[in-house]
Amino acid sequence: MDDSKVVGGKVKKPGKRGRKPAKIDLKAKLERSRQSARECRARKKLRYQYLEELVSSRERAICALREELEMYKQWCMAMDQGKIPSEIRALLTGEEQSKPQQNSSRHPKAGKTDANTNSLVGN
């Protein structure tokens, strides 16, 4: 008996399944593969450059934070000895100078809030 099968009105002969490979020029295929490899290496290089920049920026941030922490430790040690560091003194005097300006603008608002709280307490 014949090994050919009838499927959908067409006669199929036994043999390899799927698409037959097109007759591709091997040199072109090899060149495409090389180009793909070049692009892959370029992407990898860019990714590593980005990661190295990220690491160095994080290391710089860590150094800055360590310096800031050391400064705060020094301030605490000075305050434990009863000394007020000049930086803190400058911060405090800067706040005291800005407080009168803020307080004068806050008084009308504070009066309104006091009136509102008094009305709530009375209920």
Swiss-Prot record:
Domain bZIP, residue spans: 23-86
Organism listed in the record: Mus musculus (Mouse)
Polar residues bias spans: 114-123
Induction statement: Up-regulated during preadipocyte differentiation (at protein level).
Protein function: Probable regulator of CREB1 transcriptional activity which is involved in adipose cells differentiation. May also play a regulatory role in the cell cycle.
Family: Belongs to the bZIP family. ATF subfamily.
Bilayer-crossing regions: none
Post-translation changes: Phosphorylated by AMPK.
Compositional bias annotation for Basic residues: 10-21
InterPro entries: bZIP, bZIP_sf, CREBL2/REPTOR-BP
Keywords recorded for this protein, A-Z: Activator, Differentiation, DNA-binding, Nucleus, Phosphoprotein, Transcription, Transcription regulation
Gene Ontology molecular functions: DNA binding; DNA-binding transcription factor activity
Primary localisation category: nucleus
Region annotation Leucine-zipper: where it falls in the sequence: 62-69
Bridged cysteine pairs (disulfide): none
GO terms under cellular component: nucleus
Full protein name: cAMP-responsive element-binding protein-like 2
Source taxon at top rank: Eukaryota
Keyword ATP-binding carried by entry: no
Ranges for region Disordered: 1-24, 92-123
SUPFAM superfamilies xrefs: Leucine zipper domain
Expression (tissue specificity): Widely expressed with higher expression in adipose tissue, skeletal muscle, and liver (at protein level).
Compartment(s): Nucleus
Subunit structure comment from the entry: Interacts with CREB1; regulates CREB1 phosphorylation, stability and transcriptional activity.
Gene transcribed to yield this protein: Crebl2
